[in-house]
Amino acid sequence: MANVFFDVQFGGDAPKKIVFKLYDDVVPKTAANFRELATGSRGFGYKGSVFHRVITDFMAQGGDFTNFNGTGGKSIYGEKFADENFKLKHTKPALLSMANAGPNTNGSQFFITFVPCPWLDGKHVVFGEVVDGFDTLELFKKNSSQQGKPKTTIKIVDSGVV
């Protein structure tokens, strides 16, 4: 299956690309949700949304394209969908995982890890990893804070498949 890209703008700077490989073989439903939200094929998706939460030495969270603050978003399957499985673990940096509000509450929000996060295993579904644009990942880290408020606006100005 095709990889997914985001063109991410940090403040007023020129957008930087980051590319994700999705684990379609292990979590096909979760991967399909992310890929379709990246393409906007259903009339809604990630393009124009922001990373609202970027925590130093932890992760960058985005995907709320309805409220833009971490309270919204929706999946291609309706509002929320069930945890597909927890076969994959948060064993390394640069993993893609679903953000949620408890069991079986996956929508569109996701996060990219900066470090291994074993305490999230069994609670959040890992569904991909960064394969290109590690310099962009470094910009997320540079714009992180302990409280989670990004130092500048971090916006997905384009997204799709490569």
From Swiss-Prot:
<dbReference type="GO" id="GO:0003755">
    <property type="term" value="F:peptidyl-prolyl cis-trans isomerase activity"/>
</dbReference>
<dbReference type="Pfam" id="PF00160">
    <property type="entry name" value="Pro_isomerase"/>
</dbReference>
<dbReference type="InterPro" id="IPR024936">
    <property type="entry name" value="Cyclophilin-type_PPIase"/>
</dbReference>
<keyword id="KW-0697">Rotamase</keyword>
<dbReference type="InterPro" id="IPR020892">
    <property type="entry name" value="Cyclophilin-type_PPIase_CS"/>
</dbReference>
<dbReference type="GO" id="GO:0005737">
    <property type="term" value="C:cytoplasm"/>
</dbReference>
<keyword id="KW-0413">Isomerase</keyword>
<feature type="domain" description="PPIase cyclophilin-type">
    <location>
        <begin position="5"/>
        <end position="161"/>
    </location>
</feature>
<protein>
    <recommendedName>
        <fullName>Peptidyl-prolyl cis-trans isomerase</fullName>
        <ecNumber>5.2.1.8</ecNumber>
    </recommendedName>
</protein>
<dbReference type="InterPro" id="IPR029000">
    <property type="entry name" value="Cyclophilin-like_dom_sf"/>
</dbReference>
<comment type="similarity">
    <text>Belongs to the cyclophilin-type PPIase family. PPIase A subfamily.</text>
</comment>
<dbReference type="GO" id="GO:0006457">
    <property type="term" value="P:protein folding"/>
</dbReference>
<comment type="function">
    <text>PPIases accelerate the folding of proteins. It catalyzes the cis-trans isomerization of proline imidic peptide bonds in oligopeptides.</text>
</comment>
<dbReference type="GO" id="GO:0016018">
    <property type="term" value="F:cyclosporin A binding"/>
</dbReference>
<dbReference type="InterPro" id="IPR002130">
    <property type="entry name" value="Cyclophilin-type_PPIase_dom"/>
</dbReference>
